[in-house]
């Protein structure tokens, strides 16, 4: 991959899957509520230190809830017993703590799973007792029947409850649709009721899933359109060449691997084409050295092209446990990474050697995958989603990415197909002691980026095109700036909407707040032109409202006229309307 991304992008998606099912990551059911809160804060502190900007928290692992649901019982993974109130609202707490640390929180939903082991939810569970016809029985589990229209209506209500009551930044589904073990005739009853005569059963099952996705997306747009909707399906799409051609995409022959399309009846390309998701995060869980056609080197470029064709974002999901142990031939590299001599290494037990080598090779594979995600991105929206959060820390990837790949904060990518929200003016910027604070007339979806910028370049829009001076992202209107007190620098604050659109910078100078305006610059819009008055020769930067540089014009001191089409612009940080 060479030097493709020596300087990291200002915008990319950085997240982990935070699993609650079976208490994989969080919470631990043996902990008290206060201990669970403290554990989550520790996780989020670690993610912030690694400069992550999102977390996917599993809040509905098994037709249950890690939030105050109007429809489903409290999850057993909170207290050890299904239906027992944990004494606090985990989702509300998690949103507040994530936003304090500049991270989006997407509520991770498993839509269909009811029980991973038969009868674990009990005979008196509401769904089993009141709607047994909603359940499909498999060899060792039950799922909600994707082919039952009442199930679709119910799931839309469940998710609307979350979207309505909580300030989540997104809803994300995982890879569980029809089960991996395959579906033979378990849904025969639903077929007899709902499958059109002559309809291919595979097409019918895929349409059931497609309808749920479409209905969820429509509900979100109607209820709270600032909430993003994405899915993390199995990484191998698996459709045929004829289906690929009908979608207008390149066919990737992955025969021999599990097919999401024909085994899980999960068609991620269909959702992208229908524009019923905002992002897709296929679980590309095969490492770079995998020689099969579905290895990381093959899947990631293919998904990037598909996402580009459909004008949606692709954030690759990466499995940490497949970042394996090192080989003897690479031991020198291992020792270098561990900072050990060969004698020190030889003094370790076999278990310690295994752990050490796994961590060293894991960082190498992690670095390769991050670089590949960036180099193959075609939307200006690279993304990295690590599974799982516990291993993100235990493998030392948090330290590795902070020191090598995520050395600066990053904003989440702009979703250009969304209508930008109105961004507030930022006023009353002040510093009191160690606290920088400001005011803004904005709702709870708006977040803020804080830059610490050399005063000599603070008024140049190009200064804000990279993350070089980006220090914090927060939903709050104050931060501790005790680490940013160097003389000759100023604070600049921008407002950012849910889709990633960023305002002009508002700069705190010794004389007050200025809206990215150079002293002495006067700029205003007229009929078909932008008019500027400057005290000396100056570069004028004209940007679209979505942040695209349209023109750079060098003007002489005095008055100048710059002809442009009608529209809204940002000129050296000032909003300008041209008729």
Where would I find each of the regions flagged by the language model?
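Substrate-binding cleft of secreted/luminal carbohydrate-active enzymes
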Residues: 265-269, 273-292, 306-418
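Active-site-adjacent "subsite" loops/lids of carbohydrate-active enzymes
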Residues: 19, 23-37, 107, 112-161, ...
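Conserved aromatic anchor
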Residues: 433-444
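Beta-strand-rich modules
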Residues: 481-502
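C-terminal outer-membrane/trafficking sorting elements
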Residues: 451-457, 485, 512-579
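Short, small-residue-biased leader/transition segments that mark boundaries at the very start
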Residues: 2-5
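Recognizes extended acidic, P/S/T-rich segments that occur
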Residues: 447-486
């Amino acid at each position: 991959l060479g030097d493709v991304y020596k300087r990291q992008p200002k915008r990319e998606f950085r997240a982990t899957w935070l699993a609650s099912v079976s208490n994989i990551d969080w919470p631990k059911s043996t902990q008290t509520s206060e201990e669970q809160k403290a554990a989550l804060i520790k996780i989020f502190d670690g993610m912030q230190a690694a400069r992550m900007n999102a977390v996917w928290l599993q809040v509905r692992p098994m037709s249950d809830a890690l939030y105050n649901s109007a429809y489903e019982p409290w999850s057993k993974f909170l207290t050890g017993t299904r239906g027992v109130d944990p004494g606090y609202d985990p989702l509300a707490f998690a949103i507040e703590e994530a936003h304090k640390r500049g991270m989006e929180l997407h509520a991770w939903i498993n839509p269909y799973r009811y029980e991973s082991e038969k009868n674990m939810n009990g005979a008196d569970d509401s769904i089993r007792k009141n709607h047994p016809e909603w359940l499909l029985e498999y060899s060792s589990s039950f799922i909600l029947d994707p082919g039952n229209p009442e199930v679709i209506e119910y799931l839309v209500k469940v998710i609307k409850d979350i979207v309505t009551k909580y300030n989540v930044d997104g809803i994300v589904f995982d890879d569980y649709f029809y089960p991996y073990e395959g579906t033979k005739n378990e849904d025969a009853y639903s077929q007899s009721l709902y499958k059109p005569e002559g309809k291919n059963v595979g097409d019918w099952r895929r349409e059931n899933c497609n309808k749920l996705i479409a209905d969820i997306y429509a509900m979100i747009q109607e209820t709270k359109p600032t909430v993003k909707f994405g899915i993390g399906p199995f990484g191998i799409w698996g459709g045929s060449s004829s289906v690929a051609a009908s979608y207008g995409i390149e066919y990737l022959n992955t025969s021999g691997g599990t097919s999401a399309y024909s085994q899980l009846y999960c068609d991620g390309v269909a959702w992208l084409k229908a524009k019923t998701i905002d992002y897709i995060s296929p679980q590309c869980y095969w490492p770079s050295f995998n020689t099969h056609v579905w290895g990381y080197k093959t899947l990631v470029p293919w998904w990037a092209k598909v996402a580009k064709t459909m004008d949606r974002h692709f954030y690759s999901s990466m499995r940490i446990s497949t970042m394996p142990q090192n080989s003897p031939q690479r031991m020198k590299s291992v020792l270098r990474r561990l900072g050990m001599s060969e004698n020190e290494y030889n003094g370790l037990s076999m278990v310690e050697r295994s752990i050490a080598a796994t961590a060293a090779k894991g960082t190498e594979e992690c670095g390769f995958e991050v670089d590949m995600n960036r180099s193959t991105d075609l939307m200006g929206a690279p993304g990295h989603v690590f599974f799982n959060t516990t291993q993100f820390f235990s493998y030392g990837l948090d330290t590795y990415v902070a020191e090598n790949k995520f050395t600066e904060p990053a904003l989440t990518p702009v979703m250009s197909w969304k209508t930008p929200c109105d961004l507030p003016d930022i006023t009353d910027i002040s510093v009191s002691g160690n606290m920088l604070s400001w005011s803004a007339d904005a709702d709870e979806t708006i977040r803020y980026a804080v830059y610490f910028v050399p005063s000599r370049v603070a008024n140049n829009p190009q200064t804000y095109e990279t993350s070089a001076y980006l220090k914090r992202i927060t939903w709050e209107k104050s931060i501790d700036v005790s680490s940013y007190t160097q003389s000759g620098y100023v604070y600049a604050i921008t407002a950012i909407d849910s889709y990633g659109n960023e305002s002009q910078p508002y700069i705190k100078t010794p004389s007050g707040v200025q809206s990215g305006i150079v002293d002495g610059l006067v700029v205003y819009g007229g009929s078909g032109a932008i008019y500027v008055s400057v005290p000396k020769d100056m570069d004028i930067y004209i940007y679209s409202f979505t942040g695209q540089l349209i023109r750079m014009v060098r003007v002489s001191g005095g008055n100048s006229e710059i002809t442009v089409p009608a529209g809204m612009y940002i000129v050296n940080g000032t909003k300008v309307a041209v008729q």
